[in-house]
Amino acid sequence: MVSLSQDRMKQIEKRFEIIESQMAQNPNAETYVKLASEYAELQQIVTPIRTLNALYKEVTELEAMANTTQIDADMYALAQEELVLLRQKIEQLEQEIQILLLPKDIADEKSAIIEIRAGTGGSEAALFAGDLFRMYERYANAHKWKVEVVSLSDSEVGGYKEIIATISGKGVFSKLKFESGVHRVQRVPETETSGRIHTSAATVAVLPEAEEIDIEIRPEDIRIDTMRASGAGGQHVNTTDSAVRITHIPTGIMVVQAEKSQHQNRARALQILRSRLFDIERQKAESERSASRKTQVGSGDRSERIRTYNFPQGRVTDHRINLTLYKLDRIMEGDLDELINPLISNHQTALLTEINDNA
């Protein structure tokens, strides 16, 4: 493990004290909001740093006492036991602080756009896409995040050929960003009379919800077409002339929205386009910073098979970290923390390893 830089910890404490002093000088409202935001972020690191420094001091004092000639054997043994416990606390706290000091994903605190599309498997894939959406919706509700469907294309037998939704709340993307990829399901369809297990799939894409300040879309870089909604399914097909298609000319990315309000369609299509462009820039920056981490929790490639849901066995397997849980019912009800938290931990471990290798 990389040893913590005492100089860096002192710099963080010094910056925290400066911010604290500036906040006490009654700045204007705009400045105060900026200072308060930085103060809250630094406080999460400064508090454990100060606890760690207190533990360092305690160890130094205890070691000095244990090394005196005046201490008896029993007191020496007690001191050694206490030192073991203190060093364990220090090791744990140092690791927590290292994680807090890891490079931040600029999108982690953002809301997210989730896109779920039925893949191979026909109607069963569409039903599974619906199951996945309800799973994420329940997970969001448990965290008191707001879920809003942006567009959907129904399947004739239930479920969705495609559904796009925003999930709004602080830190949504940090929790859901490792959900992108191919999700495979193995189960017996209700229409299967012989009891044969079918394999189907759905793709999930999770994007950070970008704001206008995050990425600039120049008017000359987009082409906006209005048209009659028609074609591949959906409850609003052939009911409106308000469908909007926005094409980003430099990248060729195309977004179509076909709800009833043309104004709303344009705004939502721009929102999705902005988020896709922002995600491209974010992933490009991440790739340039380091390619070594991509093997740890997967590349985020939408075509990568990341997870299998086996209904007959009640089993879920995440292939990126070789994690298998026999809690399928709970997971489909939105109890995802036992899947999501290990993925986050694995990512953090990979970052620490990378820093260690480059030290």
Swiss-Prot record:
Modified residues (N5-methylglutamine): Q235
Keywords tagged on the record: Cytoplasm, Methylation, Protein biosynthesis
One GO term describing the cellular component: cytoplasm
Major localisation: cytoplasm
Region (Disordered): 283-305
Pfam families: PCRF, RF-1
InterPro entries reported for this sequence: PCRF, Pep_chain_release_fac_I, Pep_chain_release_fac_I_sf, Prokaryotic/Mito_RF, RF-1
Location in the cell: Cytoplasm
PTM note: Methylated by PrmC. Methylation increases the termination efficiency of RF1.
Job description of the protein: Peptide chain release factor 1 directs the termination of translation in response to the peptide chain termination codons UAG and UAA.
Family: Belongs to the prokaryotic/mitochondrial release factor family.
Protein name: Peptide chain release factor 1
Native organism: Bartonella bacilliformis (strain ATCC 35685 / KC583 / Herrer 020/F12,63)
Highest classification ranks of the organism: Bacteria, Pseudomonadati, Pseudomonadota, Alphaproteobacteria, Hyphomicrobiales
